[in-house]
């Protein structure tokens, strides 16, 4: 009897040890991300946890503190990372360093066909017909402004027109372009209109303060370099001009940045306090910013949704206008006072990829996880809550995203229209993209922020011979 009991206990103990061993050996994935707190909470609690339950595995989600640290963490983290979320601007550096597994290495033509059929703009993540990246979200910048402050500037234009002409004449030898009229519709604005707005705002005493109130990111990181890169494309540049770092479009881009700084159009705090996106949202709330160029997620946090802890920064949401980017042009005018070089509204389409690192222990499982986190149901929920532009073809045909007149739908409609205007403009898939962007960033800080545009501290004259909100 004692022997039987001992045998039973031994069997139970062995079963327990076996189950413990199996539990310890449960499959594991490690995902590297950079997300806002609200997006991260949604991703972990409402997406990752469901996949864990369905597939009996453990998923660890680790976060990079900023976008410029992602590659470093990927290279140094002790765990084998299965999937990484990477911005366009840093993506090709990973390919150059042979850190990414292309889909072609483990998917056959049949599965690749489904991938290309399900997702849009996949060719953005290709090089030499090899698919390196999987769409996470596409984004672009749009122009965001305070409607009431535009009206105030419009009504004050006559008072300040002579002063505006005077300062511009120092730079282009003429002043405002010939027969210039300040259009009330932001959809028709170009860089000169932004100058006019910014100059007037810099003269007005608002809440007891006189200061410039146009801003963009000013922190020394890749998010700021995109402003200069976008300007190059708006000034009719292309990837050749961008990579060559030369030509009229590059000159025009830097001249406008220098002019806005020289003429006190930009809020100096953006440089002095090294503003990122959050600082701009706060600037709108404190009346330090009346106009900027923001991504979709910027707009969501600025305006707020009332969900996911995203309450917004603006008290009067109806005072926020958003429309397409202004049209680029040259600072320089011809002998008749007309813009010497006309530009476009198009900028670059960017966003974020998912990528499978060489460290991934299970390629097929990771790809199945990617399919889960970009499934129709997950994308519908995530896009409706965070203003993301969907990457699935079937969702773009779904009226749920764009049918109502709410803020999320407005952000989506304007941004998607801007992406359509951008057409094929994207950051080139150059293996040294990181280095090139850094050169532009350093040039911006050297020439513009540090005012090294000439020995006389004046801007050099370089001879290089959707539906908007109607205010």
Describe each model-derived feature in a short phrase:
Residues 195-201, 223-231, 235-285, 325:
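Glycine-centered hinge/linker elements that transmit conformational signals in sensory
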Residues 334-340, 348, 383-449:
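Long, aromatic- and glycine/proline-rich binding clefts that accommodate carbohydrate-like moieties
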Residues 105-116, 177-180, 184, 233-255, ...:
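Short, solvent-exposed loop/beta-turn-alpha elements that line the ligand-binding surface or hinge
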Residues 67-102, 114-133, 192-208, 281-283, ...:
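Pocket-flanking alpha-helical
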Residues 88-144, 151-157, 321-325, 331-341:
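Hinge/lid segment of periplasmic solute-binding proteins
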Residues 265, 311-394:
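Extracytoplasmic/periplasmic substrate-recognition and gating elements
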Residues 21-96, 111, 157-169, 452, ...:
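Conserved N-terminal structural module of periplasmic/extracytoplasmic solute-binding proteins
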Residues 130-136, 141, 167-243:
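Extracytoplasmic/periplasmic solute-binding protein
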